[in-house]
Regions:
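Gly/Pro-enriched, hydrophobic low-complexity segments
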Residues: 1-20, 58, 66-159
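Flexible, processing/modification-adjacent segments and terminal tails
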Residues: 1-69, 80, 161-177
Length: 177
């Protein structure tokens, strides 16, 4: 993805936003495992980003993991398709249907990266949605984290848009806030 120094791909947005037809998909089953969940401390207003972002990993004092049932879905890159990940294993929360973690493998089949989606319940919407997504490169020891919302304006879920909201002039004005 842009602005991630190569640590994240565009199709990693919201954990996975790629073309599903590029992979062979297989439901491996369902299991219980510890996954990021109810990350209210990470989402708390006023917590400085410098307190959360630490060398090598997010500050564990702000993270929460819970035992949840997840569906394990394996996506193997189809022959002739190009992507830096030859395989991804998705862990999809049984309750929210959110992808809460992904194991990603390089072209040699080696375990390369781990993605975690730290979410919370937005009870007034209602929806369970990420507050921070992190991608850890296990080979380089680097990581990137995006989507911090605790010191930003609240997401406007369900906002109505029209085609005129996406004209070059309107987008230019929106970018100057």
């Amino acid at each position: 993805g842009t602005a991630s120094d190569g640590l994240r791909t565009t199709d990693n947005f919201d954990m996975f936003s790629g073309a599903p037809d590029r992979y062979n998909w297989e439901l491996k089953g369902r299991k219980e495992m510890l996954v990021p969940y109810n990350a209210y401390a990470l989402h708390a207003k006023g917590v400085a980003y410098d307190d959360i972002i630490k060398p090598g990993h997010l500050n564990a004092d702000y993270l929460r993991y819970e035992k949840h049932r997840v569906y394990v879905v394996e996506a193997t890159l189809k022959e002739g398709i190009s992507n830096i990940y030859s395989k991804r294993v998705f862990y999809i929360d049984e309750d929210s249907w959110n992808i809460v973690a992904i194991d990603m493998y390089d072209s040699r089949g080696d375990y390369w990266r781990l993605a975690e989606s730290h979410g919370i319940n937005y009870y007034d919407v209602p929806v369970y949605y990420n507050t921070v997504d992190a991608v850890y490169d296990l080979q380089s020891g680097r990581y990137t984290a995006i989507g911090f919302k605790n010191n930003e304006d609240m997401i406007k879920f369900g906002q109505d848009f029209s085609a005129s909201d996406f004209t070059p002039d309107r987008l230019r004005r929106a970018g100057r806030r």
